């Protein structure tokens, strides 16, 4: 990361043990929050090309061996197109995502979807997001300006309708930690006026905050 500032404040946390150092660091930043207990459990991800039946078969193997699974992650093959993303279920692999998700929840298994923030031209969001996006593409996908309320609303409404309303419990946000050659250059522009460099350095946190605040927390 780069900070355009004439000075730098350095804060050092010390303690008698690593635990004490981490405790002081957490308290300095407000104390943190305890995630749901299932979030601290055992996570497993399946292959990107798996369909619903293959996911269930793999989870049954764990069950037969008395190995508890708390969360299963679906790599981006659950979507019609990725990466960039449509955020829409690939119906050949997951013909009935609502039933699939409910069956997992009945077994105490949460569903976590892998995605990145960039919009595929095949997505039904593409046209609406086009004027709300940056000047450069990432892998031919739009880079929405998620500082804009309208862009946030478009994505979170779609996520609620297609994912959260049927029981999806979370997301693995991918490909938000790159540099100028991997994502977009410093001279990229965004509708909000945020610079390309500042947007790139904060994009992952912006996406996380949006999904938590505008989606999970807002809709309980």
Identify the residue ranges that each predicted region occupies.
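Carbohydrate-recognition beta-sandwich/jelly-roll modules
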Residues: 1-70, 101-103, 107-111
């Amino acid at each position: 990361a780069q900070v355009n500032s004439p000075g730098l404040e350095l804060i050092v946390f010390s303690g008698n043990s690593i635990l004490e150092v981490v405790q002081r660091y957490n308290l300095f930043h407000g104390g943190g929050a305890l995630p749901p207990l299932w979030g601290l459990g055992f996570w497993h991800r399946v292959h990107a090309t798996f369909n619903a039946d293959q996911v269930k078969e793999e989870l049954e193997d764990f069950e037969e061996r008395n190995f508890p699974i708390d969360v299963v992650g679906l790599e981006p093959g659950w979507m019609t197109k990725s990466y960039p993303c449509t955020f829409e279920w690939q119906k050949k692999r997951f013909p009935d995502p609502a039933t699939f998700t409910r069956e997992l929840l009945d077994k105490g298994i949460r569903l976590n979807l892998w995605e990145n923030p960039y919009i595929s031209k095949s997505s039904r969001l593409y046209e609406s997001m086009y004027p709300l996006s940056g000047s450069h593409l990432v892998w031919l996908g739009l880079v929405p300006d998620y500082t804009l309320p309208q862009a946030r609303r478009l994505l979170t409404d779609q996520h609620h309708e297609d994912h959260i309303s049927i029981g999806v419990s979370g997301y693995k946000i991918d490909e938000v930690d790159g540099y100028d050659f991997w994502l977009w250059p410093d001279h990229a522009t965004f509708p909000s006026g945020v610079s390309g460099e500042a947007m790139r350095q904060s994009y992952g946190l912006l996406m996380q905050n949006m999904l938590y605040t505008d989606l999970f927390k807002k809709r309980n």
